[in-house]
Amino acid sequence: MPGVRVKEAEPFELALKKFKKQCEKAGILSEVRKREHYEKPSIKKKKKAIAARKRALKKQRKMID
């Protein structure tokens, strides 16, 4: 869990920036978006297969160039 200790002379904006960076590194926002709506396992599997196919095509195109 990200947390930031704010020093007396430290501006709030800087502390907020540090907190946002820690949240991004921890992957909290992406996890929240992912869990916002329930996704059936079959749909997850389809999306995973489509992503794998896209990666393979991209890799293949890169090899040709």
UniProtKB/Swiss-Prot annotation:
The keyword Ribonucleoprotein applies. GO terms for molecular function: structural constituent of ribosome. One of its GO terms (biological process) is translation. It comes from the Bacteria. One of its GO terms (cellular component) is ribosome. Disulfide bonds: none annotated. Pfam families: Ribosomal_S21. The keyword Ribosomal protein applies. Gene3D superfamilies: Ribosomal protein S8 (1.20.5.1150). InterPro entries: Ribosomal_bS21, Ribosomal_bS21_sf. Keywords: Ribonucleoprotein, Ribosomal protein. PANTHER family: MITOCHONDRIAL 28S RIBOSOMAL PROTEIN S21, SMALL RIBOSOMAL SUBUNIT PROTEIN BS21. NCBIfam families: S21p. Belongs to the bacterial ribosomal protein bS21 family. This is Small ribosomal subunit protein bS21. The lineage of its organism: Bacteria, Pseudomonadati, Thermodesulfobacteriota, Desulfuromonadia, Geobacterales.
